[in-house]
Amino acid sequence: MERIRKKPIAVSRGAIVFAFNSSKYNYAQMAVYTARRIEAFLGIPTTLVTDIESFKTIINDKDVFDSIIEVEPDTSNMREQHAWINKGRYQAYELSPYEETLVLDVDYLVNSDCLLKTFDLSDSFCCHKNTHMLMHPEAAQEKMSAYSYDTLWATVIMFKKSNRAKQIFETLEMV
């Protein structure tokens, strides 16, 4: 059952993206591209959360962002022998300047205005439960372990400032 808001509410809406460059990828440059697509397809502002070293690589493109928040990156997460700085997304609730926020991976391509519909849902927190692999359409959905819950995906999150959303982000910080 779809839960839709009965009346539209005038609130601040925007997107927040996290970008910390690695030795392999320039995530800040990806964030610039993503912010341009967010503006073109969704018509909402984008806030960038990054570190000073990553920001230096896009200083000429800084105007694409509504605001830029500099944070100290958590480099303790390793993936394939490289630092994978992706642990700070639990801060999205506190860092977002918007009442209603889309949290997007910088490598997620916005190609339509469909994500705007998430703001019309009455839920205060939404994320994807399922993935669809184009090259492997029959692939099983991932679980955190064999005896665990289904994996929920943080590629796209919509949240509204509320007690429920705040509690979810506080829980994410503990994981």
Question: For the regions a protein language model found, what residue spans apply to each?
Answer:
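Glycosyltransferase catalytic domains, chiefly GT-A lineage
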Residues: 1-175
